UniProtKB/Swiss-Prot annotation:
Primary localisation category: nucleus
Protein name: Zinc finger protein 264
SMART domains hit by this protein: KRAB, ZnF_C2H2
Biased composition (Basic and acidic residues): 74-93, 136-151
Segments forming C2H2-type zinc fingers: 203-225, 231-253, 259-281, 287-309, 315-337, 343-365, 371-393, 399-421, 427-449, 455-477, 483-505, 511-533, 539-561
Gene Ontology CC annotations of this record: nucleus
Lineage of the species this protein comes from: Eukaryota, Metazoa, Chordata, Craniata, Vertebrata
Domain KRAB: 14-85
Organism listed in the record: Homo sapiens
Tissue: Relatively highly expressed in kidney, thymus, testis, ovary, brain, lung, placenta, and prostate, and relatively low expression in heart, liver, skeletal muscle, pancreas, spleen, and small intestine.
InterPro entries from the UniProt entry: KRAB, KRAB_dom_sf, Znf_C2H2-type, Znf_C2H2_sf, Znf_C2H2_type
The family this protein is said to belong to: Belongs to the krueppel C2H2-type zinc-finger protein family.
Length: 627
């Protein structure tokens, strides 16, 4: 009884016109997308509350328009037409009916609906307030079958459930004239659930064919094609298609991070980022590849992985036609054509194509190396460098060459190695036309043309074109020899020197001549040997035109023209010094009588405590004449 009194009082005190807001076509056109969406949500919510209280809702056409995402204003010539798609072709009546199911006193929270009074006999039993809210969200309470909610009260032609917004799409009243004549929606002859009917009212994009079930969603999507970005950030001027994107972006300026991980305390400015981060702790990988079974934490990584199986490369460079699987790779490549270097270092003025390169460069000024290896304590500027380094400790080499079986610890190393088999040399010098297999070699070669030597020694000021050369040179100042042979204890300043030295102990000769099968320990020896077969003599004397197969042979030959010999002696058995008569080491070892040195002493001291075995160059003393 109390509920009935409350309902009667609500019907008297509140009407739909009291809470409704209407716009003309011109006023509606001045609203932006966010304001229109807010208006639709508020109007539908108010209507739902009035229906739950049993109040009549006469503006059926307005509500139906809002349900389908359409404009709330109507043309006069449309007032005589049917409001809902299911009513086409039906005769109009003037029987006043309302969509105002009253609250039943016996409704159970578990979904058991007891029979009660109903204003409209064809709409049947009403839902409780919780049930209406669930309908507004587009779903029903668990355990309740939509067909079982009001048994015996529904017309077989209309289930009366309403649309996803919780308002019956067959509201039953439509204003057709100033005299407030209405027609009745007594039944829906379509025989379909209005939820299904709403899905069939699809709005299709004329540009790409994408389909939406709401008109305002289509309007938002069309901005992608038109390029309209009406929402502008007041801080940096960046524009966005959606207001939600602007709100998310604004947190970058405010520094706000409201979503905090309960496990590690890390905070994020978006809830989706927190959800993705929490999968690290839970180990959840919901995205699984059907081809190889590999699972991923993030959907974006899963999509990129799938392109490896399909071979899809979605991003095509309009300048050179090169295609890329990933958008970041495409953007990095495109800067090569534009020549743009928008990121400048405030310390030294150096400019970079990419922001990440600038960030890495800035760490050279600060000396910061935030990534530390847990095994050996070595620190790195970049996380990628740490990952590359860590494979040294694990010894893992998962990338194997199918041609020769050689394995590598990084995919990039395998790709570079495979060019040896294919003979591919994609990097061509525009100056001389020389081609290279590796990009790093190509960059070093270009410095030969430009004369650039960006790596300078802080000790002596000597500059180098290659960073590795600087590292090798610096060991001269430090005297450090970190690479020690475990067999004999000999130490080396370079890793390559130790590797070559180890071949002496192992007897390994990996460099084999394809002509005669002779093997060598070092690649340089193989190169020298190969000249024997080719007959090539690239080193030519500029004086007489004689050619040699080795540079050392040319150097020796040129001394005949200059008259200079590299070794100077005061006397045999004493250290060599400059400024005295010079002889070649070859002649000295052969024991040729050539010496013509100004000295008062014999070439070999007469008094010596050394044995003959300690004097490898001792021989009969020649007569020395004065100059």
């Amino acid at each position: 009884m109390a509920a009935a009194v409350l309902t009667d009082r609500a019907q008297v005190s509140v009407t739909f016109d009291d809470v409704a807001v209407t716009f003309t076509k011109e006023e509606w056109g001045q609203l932006d997308l966010a304001q229109r969406t807010l208006y639709q949500e508020v109007m539908l919510e108010n209507c739902g509350l009035l229906v739950s209280l049993g109040c009549p809702v006469p503006k059926a056409e307005l509500i139906c328009h809002l349900e389908h995402g359409q404009e709330p204003w109507t043309r006069k010539e449309d007032l005589s037409q049917d409001t809902c798609p299911g009513d086409k072709g039906k005769p109009k009546t003037t029987e006043p009916t309302t969509c105002e199911p009253a609250l039943s006193e016996g409704i159970s929270l578990q979904g058991q609906v007891t029979q009660g009074n109903s204003v409209d006999s064809q709409l049947g039993q009403a839902e409780d307030q919780d049930g209406l809210s669930e309908m507004q969200e587009g779903h029903f309470r668990p355990g309740i079958d939509p067909q079982e909610k009001s048994p015996g009260k529904m017309s077989p032609e209309c289930d009366g459930l309403g649309t996803a917004d919780g308002v019956c799409s067959r509201i039953g009243q439509e204003q057709v004239s100033p005299g407030d004549r209405v027609r009745s929606h007594n039944s829906c002859e379509s025989g379909k659930d209005p939820m299904i009917q709403e899905e069939e009212n699809n709005f299709k994009c004329s540009e790409c064919g994408k389909v939406f079930n709401k008109k305002h969603l289509l309007a938002g999507h069309e901005k992608i094609h038109s390029g309209v970005k009406p929402y502008e950030c007041t801080e940096c001027g960046k524009t966005f298609i959606k207001s939600t994107h602007l709100l998310q972006h604004h947190m970058i300026h405010t520094g706000e991070r409201p979503y905090e991980c309960m496990e590690c305390g890390k905070a994020f400015n978006r809830k989706s980022y927190l959800t993705q981060h929490q999968r690290i702790h839970s180990g959840e990988k919901p995205y699984k590849c059907n081809e190889c079974g590999k699972a991923f934490t993030h959907r974006s990584n899963f999509v990129l992985h799938n392109r490896r199986h399909t071979g899809e490369k979605s991003f095509v460079c309009t300048e050179c036609g090169q295609v890329f699987r990933h958008r970041p790779g495409f953007l990095r490549h495109y800067v090569v054509h534009s020549g743009e270097n928008p990121y400048e270092c405030l310390e030294c003025g150096k400019v970079f194509k990419h922001r990440s390169y600038l960030m890495w460069h800035q760490q050279t000024h600060t000396g910061e190396k935030p990534y530390e290896c847990s095994e050996c304590g070595k620190v790195f500027l970049e996380s990628a460098a740490l990952i590359h380094h860590y494979v040294i400790h694990t010894g893992e080499k998962p990338f194997e060459c199918l041609e020769c079986g050689k394995a590598f610890n990084h995919r990039s190393y395998l790709k570079r190695h495979q060019r040896i088999h294919t003979g591919e040399k994609p990097f061509v010098c525009s100056e001389c036309g020389k081609a290279f297999t590796h990009c790093s070699t190509f960059i070093l070669h270009k410095r030969a043309h430009t004369g650039e030597k960006p790596f300078e020694c802080k000790e002596c000021g000597k500059a180098f074109s290659n960073r590795k050369d600087l590292i090798r040179h610096f060991s001269i100042h430090t005297g450090e020899k970190p690479y020690e042979c475990v067999e004999c204890g000999k130490a080396f300043t370079r890793m390559s020197g130790l590797t070559r030295h180890k071949r002496i102990h192992s007897g390994e000769k990996p460099y084999e001549c394809v002509e005669c099968g002779k093997s060598f320990c070092w690649s340089t020896n193989l190169i020298r040997h190969a000249i024997i077969h080719t007959g090539e003599k690239p080193y030519k004397c500029s004086e007489c035109g004689k050619a040699f197969s080795r540079s050392s042979s040319l150097t020796q030959h040129q001394r005949m023209h200059t008259g200079k010999n590299p070794i100077s002696v005061t006397d045999v058995g004493r250290p060599f010094t400059s400024g005295q008569t010079s002889v070649t080491l070859r002649e000295l070892l052969l024991g040729k009588d050539f010496l013509n040195v100004t000295t008062e002493a014999n070439i070999l001291p007469e008094e010596t405590s050394s044995s003959a075995s300690d004097q490898p160059y001792q021989r009969e003393t020649p007569q020395v004449s004065s100059l």
